[in-house]
Swiss-Prot record:
Principal location listed in the UniProt entry: secreted
Free-text note on domains in this protein's UniProt record: The RxLR-dEER motif acts to carry the protein into the host cell cytoplasm through binding to cell surface phosphatidylinositol-3-phosphate.
Keywords for this protein: Host cytoplasm, Host nucleus, Secreted, Signal, Virulence
Protein known as: Secreted RxLR effector protein 149
Subcellular location as annotated: Secreted; Host nucleus; Host cytoplasm
Protein family according to the UniProt entry: Belongs to the RxLR effector family.
Ranges spanned by the short sequence motif RxLR-dEER, renumbered to the chain: 43-58
Leader sequence residues: 1-21
Species for this entry: Plasmopara viticola (Downy mildew of grapevine)
Length: 270
């Protein structure tokens, strides 16, 4: 049984490496189509197609997680393990969980690298926000990397700084919500939307449709939070519906958004 676990673990590690290498290579090749040069002659990466990024994540999970989870459920009899190795990192009883943790770490790393391509510069970050990228999604990736790494990640400080910057920038967009009367800087976002590629516009539309469906269902704040509905896309939806042009008759909708932003931030910081 022990030899079987060892052989299967080695096979899975090799297979996982091949799959991830092919996915990363494909992603890198495709991303060259999005490369441009700025006015200083430096190469920059513009936002990739959000749909392609989600598809790549699904492909990785479908290719790796089922097998990894199956390994994680393997039970190795303690009798099959020499007593001298029970407390060692080489203990075969610990291998299934270690393999599963390693796969989850790889997937989190791939997600982070894909997201870096969509958040190069403030405009790209704003486009990502419009397409529904939420602080909680980034927090999950950050936590997975920290949790499943066998030691402190070499780029821990950079990951934390990038996350903190995104969160600060994200909630900074709600300042106008607390003015009297509440306002929304529509011109900036409309101009940014006009400059989007068709793929980005489609991602923007899908994010708005998702929020619209759930808001129209009358879901509670807790239900919206459980679905990780973007407070920013929610605010843009209200603007598109003319709520901020008629504040007096729409204060109930604005107050609901304020409550949601408050709850969302509280849970995020918890």
């Amino acid at each position: 049984m022990r030899n079987g676990v060892v052989l299967f673990g080695l096979f899975f590690i090799g297979y996982s490496s091949c799959v991830l290498a092919s996915l990363v290579e494909k992603s890198d090749v495709e991303s060259t189509h999005a490369e441009q040069w700025d006015s200083n002659g430096k190469r920059t990466l513009q936002a990739d197609d959000p749909e392609r990024i989600l598809a790549e994540e699904r492909n990785m999970e479908q290719a790796l997680l089922p097998a990894a989870e199956a390994i994680g459920k393997i039970k190795v009899s303690e009798k099959a393990v020499p007593r001298a190795s029970l407390g060692s990192t080489l203990n075969p009883m610990k291998w299934p969980k270690r393999i599963l943790d390693k796969v989850r770490l790889w997937l989190a790393r791939i997600r982070l690298n894909l997201l870096k391509r969509t958040t190069v510069g403030e405009d790209s970050i704003d486009r990502a926000m419009m397409n529904g990228l939420t602080p909680f999604y980034l927090k999950k990736i950050k936590n997975d990397i920290m949790h499943y790494s066998s030691s402190v990640p070499h780029d821990k400080i950079k990951i934390e700084e990038d996350y903190d910057f995104y969160v600060k920038h994200f909630f900074g967009q709600f300042k106008g919500l607390y003015k009297d009367p509440p306002v929304f800087a529509v011109d900036k976002w409309n101009k940014l939307e006009e400059g989007m590629t068709k793929a980005e516009q489609n991602g923007n539309r899908r994010a708005s449709d998702k929020v619209s469906r759930n808001i129209d269902k009358g879901l509670s704040i807790d239900q919206l939070f459980s679905l990780d509905i973007s407070p920013f896309v929610y605010m843009r939806l209200l603007e598109k519906r003319g709520v901020f042009k008629d504040v007096e008759n729409n204060m109930d909708k604005i107050d609901h958004l304020k409550d949601y932003v408050k709850v969302y931030k509280e849970h995020l910081m918890a």
